[in-house]
């Protein structure tokens, strides 16, 4: 492999890498945030969850602000670099569909923000864990409907393109 081909190979692989990060983040959210709704923690969770979520959101929002747009940008760039090669290998449609699934993640933004707002405000009072359970269900659905298919498409695209 020549040094000239290396940047193109890396470009082809990067959407698979960033979508792996997105999918891993969704899994981490589910595993970590799901702890708050365990029966043994419910009472303290109802008291502490709003402050924890508000503080935590400031710490992990950089992933949302940086990684997701990078994932979208890499998907788009791949569609415009070496288009003939992508068509010949059949990777073009996989990158396109992967990008669409990845962008579909943002279709859940209003629902996610509404549920996060309820958690931060401690709604319903005395049972905020029910709002967390609602957010967790939405997050699981979003990951299975958008993030996992995007990852599958980007990995398939990279395998075809490389």
Swiss-Prot record:
Signal peptide coordinates: 1-26
Q: What is its EC number?
A: 1.14.-.-
Q: Please provide one cellular component term from the Gene Ontology annotations of this protein.
A: membrane
Q: Name one GO molecular function term.
A: oxidoreductase activity
Instruction: Give the protein's function.
Output: Epoxidase; part of the gene cluster that mediates the biosynthesis of pyrrocidines, fungal natural products containing a macrocyclic para-cyclophane connected to a decahydrofluorene ring system that show potent antibiotic activities toward Gram-negative bacteria. Within the pathway, pydX functions synergistically with pydB, pydE and pydZ to form the cyclophane.
- Entry membrane topology: Multi-pass membrane protein
Q: What is its main location?
A: membrane
What the record says about family reads: Belongs to the epoxidase xenD family.
Membrane-spanning intervals of the chain? 62-82, 89-109
Q: In which pathway does it act?
A: Mycotoxin biosynthesis
Q: What is this protein called?
A: Epoxidase pydX
Location of this chain's protein in the cell: Membrane
Give the glycosylated residues: 127, 139
Keywords on record: Glycoprotein, Membrane, Oxidoreductase, Signal, Transmembrane, Transmembrane helix, Virulence
């Amino acid at each position: 492999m020549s040094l000239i081909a290396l940047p193109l190979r890396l470009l082809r692989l990067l959407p698979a890498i960033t979508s792996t990060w997105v999918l891993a983040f969704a899994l981490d959210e589910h595993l970590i945030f799901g702890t708050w709704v365990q029966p043994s923690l419910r009472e303290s969770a109802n008291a502490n969850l709003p402050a924890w979520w508000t503080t935590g959101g400031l710490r992990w929002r950089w992933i949302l602000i940086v990684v997701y747009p990078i994932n979208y940008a890499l998907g788009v760039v791949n569609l415009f670099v070496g288009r003939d090669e992508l068509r010949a290998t059949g990777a073009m449609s996989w990158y396109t569909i992967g990008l669409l699934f990845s962008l579909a993640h943002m279709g859940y933004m209003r629902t996610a923000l509404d549920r996060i707002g309820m958690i931060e405000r401690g709604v319903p009072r005395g049972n905020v864990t029910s709002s967390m359970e609602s957010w967790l269900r939405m997050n699981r659905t979003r990951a299975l409907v958008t993030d996992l298919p995007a990852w599958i498409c980007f990995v398939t695209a990279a395998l075809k393109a490389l």
